[in-house]
Amino acid sequence: MELHTHRAISARLCGAPRLLASGGAEVELETVDDMRADELGLVHGGFVFGLADYAAMLAINEPNVVLGSAEMRFLAPVVVGDRLLATARLLGVEGKRHRVEVHVNRSAERVFEGTFVCFVPPAHVLAPATGGVS
């Protein structure tokens, strides 16, 4: 399957697609020193969230997909050097609204889980508005 969204994203910071399927995706991330939050090597949760968000976007794989909201839980700490795998599965679609479940694992241990609500607008969110009054 061809990648249709988030083509310019940094694989080093957000992960690299491992699997693209209709309604699902897997993204792998090796955590690096730039993600370190402290002297013990704790990885800032924003990088784990970014990985999960990217997997959700790829499960939908529409060019204009954006995140609307997320309900998630961090289940275990991640440290520099950990290899993470995010698995995303489309739960349902209602119009432009897509619900995606994402799990992030380090080997067999789950470190993050969440449900993402994404939207697919007809045009890119940064595209100039057309028509209307200026």
Identify what each model region corresponds to.
Residues 54-90:
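Hydrophobic beta-strand-centered segment that forms part of the acyl-chain substrate-binding groove
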Residues 12, 69, 97-99:
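Short coil/loop residues immediately preceding or within conserved phosphate-binding loops
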Residues 29-31, 74, 120:
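Hydrophobic residues in beta-strands and at strand termini
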Residues 64, 79-80, 89-134:
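HotDog/MaoC-like acyl-thioester-processing domains
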Residues 30-50:
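A conserved, well-ordered hydrophobic junction motif at loop->secondary-structure transitions
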Residues 13, 17-19, 52-61:
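Alpha-helix C-terminal capping segments
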Residues 1-35, 129-134:
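Non-catalytic linker/capping segments at the edges of enzyme domains
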